């Protein structure tokens, strides 16, 4: 077997039984008798396996490197999930008064472990109040018309949600959102999972140094979910955003802009945790996969880091 594979490289393992398994390179035994892959699926119709799978030289016919297009990102969202999220984005609830619908929305949001918070409407930071606030669960999007409800919206439940430890808020670049909420609406945003920060950490772990620029929400949706760049509208018309009644076009854009944030956060969180999971897998295999003599030797070195560990936790 070739030993010039890089971590994450897409490979196909062809077995002597004529089965084909496709996955990403994880590691190889020093004597090249075993290759390990993750994100493995059986070709052509198998589902992806979450764990690390091992293939031995005695069962392998050949290992094939697959070329991936540099233009097309690896799609990490199924067509079914994509269509499901689009349906959710079209069934948003627009709220412009503190009534039964408002309180039902607040109750629904409070029952969640995570909610998404859109930065749309806070583009000017502390220079002006937010015309709207968009929050969502993983199944329902709510557009609150702050321009109409004013401070009543925050006093009636939104402030408590945004300032509370729970639910945790998912945002992409919360800087201006936090600034606007604090200086214009007396709301101190707390307990945030920021997907832009997550992307920076992943990039630093992969490239050692931080990038010069941050990625927009659209860029992250393309990088992590494989979505088209024009899936969302990142440049909402400021004038139209303050006109009332709020146009259907603006409301549709607001809903679509937040719709994929939950799934994006899951993918980014999973990728941030990847070195940890690989490190644990290394520990699981370290002694177990050794012969008796080697296992005895390793048991006497438990105060040392396994030789394979550093390679295992690299992206």
Curated annotation (Swiss-Prot):
GO cellular component, as recorded: P granule; PET complex
Domain 3'-5' exonuclease intervals: 141-228
Keywords in alphabetical order: Cytoplasm, Meiosis, RNA-binding, RNA-mediated gene silencing
One MF annotation (Gene Ontology) recorded for this entry: RNA binding
GO term, biological process aspect, one: regulatory ncRNA-mediated gene silencing
Stored InterPro entries: 3'-5'_exonuclease_dom, piRNA_biogenesis_EXD1, RNaseH-like_sf, RNaseH_sf
Location (main, coarse): cytoplasm
The UniProt record lists the keyword Cytoplasm: yes
Compartments in which it is found: Cytoplasm
Subunit structure: Homodimer. Component of the PET complex, at least composed of EXD1, SIWI, TDRD12 and piRNAs.
Similarity comment: Belongs to the EXD1 family.
Free-text note regarding domains: The 3'-5' exonuclease domain lacks the conserved Asp-Glu-Asp-Asp (DEDD) residues that coordinates divalent ions essential for exonuclease activity.
Function (record text): RNA-binding component of the PET complex, a multiprotein complex required for the processing of piRNAs during spermatogenesis. The piRNA metabolic process mediates the repression of transposable elements during meiosis by forming complexes composed of piRNAs and Piwi proteins and governs the methylation and subsequent repression of transposable elements, preventing their mobilization, which is essential for the germline integrity. The PET complex is required during the secondary piRNAs metabolic process for the PIWIL2 slicing-triggered loading of PIWIL4 piRNAs.
Protein known as: piRNA biogenesis protein EXD1
Record organism: Bombyx mori (Silk moth)
Lineage: Eukaryota, Metazoa, Ecdysozoa, Arthropoda, Hexapoda
Gene name of the encoded protein: EXD1
